[in-house]
């Protein structure tokens, strides 16, 4: 299911997997600042948005320099009929957020995206918090 936040012009729209504010959204805004964005629920929905001409392109994460390959894309892209036509490198800075007054040493669980957890594995080991995966 694709989530459309606003009416978009498909010829000036770039689709991405995730919510507004996700790393892929930031990459879209940096790489194509004059494009409208189309947030999609899944990688399949993102690719379908281009196949169905609801977007002219998709910002597709293929690799994370710390956490490695984005495996789902490497399985989906070959059968999509789509091709890589450009490349963008997105710098990502992770931050640990908590409620006011929370102390790092009291944390028992950290909820985040699988790749963000992978990038933070040293911190997670240091504070002995359990990693809980979320889509975004």
Feature names for model-found ranges:
Residues 1-136:
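Domain-level signature for soluble enzymes in the chorismate/prephenate branch of the shikimate pathway
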């Amino acid at each position: 299911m694709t989530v459309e936040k606003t009416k978009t012009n498909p010829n000036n729209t770039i689709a991405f997997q995730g919510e507004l504010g996700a790393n892929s959204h930031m990459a879209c805004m940096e790489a194509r600042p004059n494009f409208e964005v189309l947030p999609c629920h899944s990688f399949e929905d993102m690719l379908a948005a281009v196949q169905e001409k609801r977007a002219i392109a998709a910002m597709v994460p293929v690799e994370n320099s710390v956490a490695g390959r984005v495996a789902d894309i490497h399985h989906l892209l070959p059968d999509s009929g789509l091709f890589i036509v450009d490349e963008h490198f997105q710098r990502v800075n992770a931050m640990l957020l908590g409620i006011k007054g929370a102390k790092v040493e009291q944390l028992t669980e950290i909820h985040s995206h699988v790749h963000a957890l992978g990038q933070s594995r040293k911190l997670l080991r240091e504070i002995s918090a359990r990693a809980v995966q979320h889509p975004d």
